[in-house]
Amino acid sequence: MITAPAHQISQEAQGFAITVLFLAIVLASVIVAARPAQAQMFEVLYSFQGSPDASGPTGPFVRDAAGNFFSTSAGGGTFGQGTAFKLSGPGKETVLYSFCLQLYCHEGGNPTAGLAGDTQGNLYGTASGGSFDTGFVFQLSPTGGEVVLYNFTGAADGAFPDGRLLRDAEGNLYGNAAGGGAYRNCGLDNAEGCGVVFKVTTTGTEAVLYNFTGGADGAQPVGALVRDQKGNFYGATLTGGKYGYGTVFRLDGGGNETVLHSFRLNQTGHSDGANPNGDLIRDSKGNLYGTTSSGGNLNSDGVVFKLSKTGKETVLYRFQGGLDGIIPLGGLVRDLKGNLYGTTVYGGGYENCYNYGCGTVFKVDTAGREIALHRFTGGADGGNPPGGLFRDAQGISTARLPTAAFQRTARMAAELSSS
């Protein structure tokens, strides 16, 4: 799967359209639909009601050829422990499957990473729990039947899968597991494992493509993988690396890892980012773009960065901790002119959410200038978006927003200028 210049994710091998949407979680249960960008209007498309309906959607959407959207929720459903659901239009939602973490279920739940799909309408994802309580990979049929393809044991095979799965033309699934693996010197008790990159075949056989050691190569891989035309994978680790603050890595088809960049927290004379936490995107020239959740200025408010094919890093913008935003946790989207768009969890000037502000939607242009396109108020528009945006061909971008109540949810869409 190759990320196109406008961050349109190719799902051709899967029969799914290129749109990936993010849910917004807000107290007022609204979708924010701006048209045009200068005159934003808000519209409720669907309010999740909690069990037996879905609750707390956290993963990205995928869209099928008929225009239906599919995703996962961490809560809700028959057992209150997560769902896979379909949104077929305003006010039209169907719970396709209810996950169960109870002892009598022998399954798992709380899926947070969203879904991938194939040409037959099957859906694939990951969730917590499973036979060993360290996560599993599942398949859902078009009729809602579930098959567990693989249960992670928490040993050398990995644990705690993180990020949306990537599916190739042969049906193999690829992803990151933030724990487990051959090296156990990571985690709070130094026994959780440093994480792996894994592959699961159509028959449910799992193979570890790379074991992170927790040293210079990184630890705790996060987010989704990106793949180029040559079959190389790109991803990020939250920690590890030369300085201990995370890496961006490349993994070739033979399982050889190259660290493209090791992040370095603020030190005298140095203002790199630290701890990348969102998905990477890749342009047609092979440059990678992403965000870090800390580093940058002295207050460690995060950065937007670019990496060349050779690993040369350019910090495009350092957040200042005010109206511009604080802590970008999600990934970025990029338009045809090279402008980057994303969200910050805090900042923006409105303190109805926390003392640090309710968050922003921002744009960083090719000259490194940042504009806060929307400052969340914590009211009807929501607040504190932890995820990134998606920008389609019409310039419609979406984000997800959290709420302390975590009861009512909806999708937030904002039409952004493509200029």
What are the residue ranges of the model-derived segments?
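Extracellular beta-propeller repeat domains
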Residues: 2-419
